[in-house]
């Protein structure tokens, strides 16, 4: 869970293991792991390097890219955080073979949003993708395209003052219905 208690346990593990300002934290998991791990790295010893290895579709196309890190606090989602981009994001789409339907479609919905805000070709490819009979080679290409859409927007607006707000489309309503 993205809580202060979990964050403290990550800091404690880093400290106990003798991590220094030159250490590297590897975040392997879904969006909760990349958000919390990124924030732990951004704040431990005033910032250590970290890489994200996302294992869910949503984490691949959203949470692990763009540098928004944080935890939930006082009942509010992502209330405490920092803009701290990962040193690297390693995407291995083989992890997607392990996803259940719910987790697949939560990531696919994010990809559809990227298609809406990018170009008609990407949008058409996403609409033509057969989610009932997943072609993982095609999905790998679509993931790469969605990541590029997000990276292009983040590069233009790293601190979410303008165009990057388009990436929040749907998040405001969804935050009220999704679990912490």
Regions found by a protein language model. Give the residues of each.
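A glycine/threonine-rich phosphate-anchoring loop and its flanking beta-alpha core
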Residues: 38-129
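ATP/NTP phosphate-donor binding region
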Residues: 1-24
């Amino acid at each position: 869970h993205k809580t202060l208690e979990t964050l403290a346990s990550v800091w404690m593990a880093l400290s106990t293991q003798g991590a220094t300002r030159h250490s590297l934290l590897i975040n392997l998991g879904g969006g909760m792991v990349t958000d919390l791990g990124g924030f732990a790295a951004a704040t431990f010893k005033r910032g250590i390097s970290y890489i994200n290895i996302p294992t869910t579709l949503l984490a691949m196309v959203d949470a692990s890219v763009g540098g928004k890190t944080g935890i939930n606090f006082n009942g509010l989602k992502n209330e405490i955080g920092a803009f701290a981009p990962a040193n690297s994001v390693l995407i291995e789409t083989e992890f997607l073979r392990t996803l259940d339907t719910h987790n697949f479609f939560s990531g696919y919905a994010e990809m559809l949003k990227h298609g809406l805000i990018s170009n008609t070709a990407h949008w058409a490819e996403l609409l033509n993708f057969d989610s009932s009979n997943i072609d993982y080679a095609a999905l790998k290409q679509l993931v790469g395209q969605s990541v590029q859409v997000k990276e292009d927007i983040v590069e233009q607006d790293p601190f979410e003052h303008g165009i990057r707000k388009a990436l929040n489309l749907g998040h405001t309503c969804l935050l009220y219905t999704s679990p912490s």
